[in-house]
């Protein structure tokens, strides 16, 4: 096994240009070891040496991909900055604050592109996914049952239509299973429900389109086996009173449902600490990373591409584990969760197209340049506007 690890370390050092610290290397070796142990548990016939080599290759490939992502990210961010600087200068001149506002939410006026903001783009992109999705569901005669299922969930809160609610919950279970089957054929369980298969096919078609468009805008989103829809977390249900007993209740509910790969990056003996950190994040609503949908790399604060491209923190064992957790601690129906995913994709694409892979940092850099420019011409009112809370 040591040989497999050394090969991994050498390859990663070459990829990183020799800038990895001893702590970085120790973390990488720990990652390889944890994965190798999981592979051995999952397939005892594979053998320790083969499992170690497989884990080492996987980690090496991920590190190489991360280096490519960083290079691509820098190029995209330079281009976005040039575009935004040229746009504000050409169309708003010395009214830089108005130009920044136009980029974010749009402004009234006759300036070219005054209404083409990040906000309006996000809504238009999401509509571009949802309109064709709804039309295709209608054409295949399955839209009505999804809408009825969604409406009856509201009735469930007051005890109405319990029989129909149970029927539609079963339909949603089968849709979830068929979505899982599409991305994880090896773990597929056939529901023998033609309607569920058709709905899953249509959902997956537009989810993959959203994934591809996010990649084109600057993300690096791969496919994860077993992806169903955007995971929701109801922080009120998860948090309870915010006491230790509430964490234990959540932990005991989710732990049997999680796949072992959830803990690949968790040091030995730190599982409880890891789960408590996830619970705290979900309870406070700070859970972007915990519900990130797909794979990737990146480092850096506020990096949207990192959030989009990061591997999910919570991996479920199977479709029913995902569904049962979503019923207990998520919110909304499967349809609502899917719609939420498309709305999020619209926001992500608009932000990436406007600002690049790190929108917050890109905005602050551009604003800082605008402040310097206004200061040089001693336009202190414009400086105040640029530094104001409205931006």
State where each predicted segment sits.
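Structural preference for well-ordered, secondary-structure-rich domains
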Residues: 1-391
